[in-house]
Each structure stands twice: as structure tokens, then as C-alpha cells.
Amino acid sequence: MTGRVKKTNPRLTSLITTLKDASRTGEVKIWRDIANRLEASTSAHAEVNISKINRYAAEGETILVPGKVLGSGMLNQSVRVAALNFSESAVSKIAKAQGTCMTIEELLANNPKGSRVRILR
């Protein structure tokens, strides 16, 4: 008998519920997409290195990672990065480049329409 595996991380389940609610009330599809990506198994969550953010992001852009940001590589520009988790080295490298680290919850509060956000996977 196959059943649906329930997430045991209370922060993650709360975030998924909040994103779905924001998607419904604001009719913003980006939050539904992120909620669906976070509902997938943990092994399917994104793991993005700083080097990939540096390659695909423009100066001052907002990047959303539905998973963890890792510290491999260099960051040469100031970007705002929202993610589920950050490694310690990623936080220090983003701060060194005068960028900003934030949670997905903070991004949702600051930008409820989800405009001008780039999703990296």
C-alpha cells in the first residue's frame, strides 16, 4: 500500500501552506510553483552554488532558490538571495559582495506579487 509521505519539518509545512494561501489570495502563480517544488522529496530540492548565482544573476536582482544555497564559487555582484537554507560560507560570500540573504518567508512579505524575481534551480 502506497501512501503520501508527510513532511516532518514544521517550518517547511508552514511555508508550503503560506505559499499556497498567498498564491490563491493574490492570484500569483510563482508562489504555487515554489510550493509545489518544496512539496517534492528533499532530495529533489534545489542545491545552488554561489557560482551559478554569479553566472545567471544581474546586479541588484532578486534570486529565489527553492532549496539550499551552497558556498562554492565567487560572487562578484550585489544580489538579494532568498532560499529555504544557506550554508555558512554562502552567507559570508553574499555579505562580502554586499548582497542580502533572506528566507522565502521574508521575500513573500516584502514582495507579495513575486515580481522581478528569478528562480534558480
Curated annotation (Swiss-Prot):
Key words, A-Z: Ribonucleoprotein, Ribosomal protein
Matches recorded under InterPro entries: Ribosomal_eL18, Ribosomal_eL18_arc, Ribosomal_uL15/eL18, Ribosomal_uL15/eL18_sf
NCBIfam families tied to this protein: PRK04005.1
GO molecular function, one term: structural constituent of ribosome
Family to which this protein belongs: Belongs to the eukaryotic ribosomal protein eL18 family.
Name of the protein: Large ribosomal subunit protein eL18
Name of the encoding gene: rpl18e
Gene Ontology CC annotations of this record: cytosolic large ribosomal subunit
Biological processes annotated in GO: translation
Organism: Methanosphaerula palustris (strain ATCC BAA-1556 / DSM 19958 / E1-9c)
Pfam families tied to this protein: Ribosomal_L18
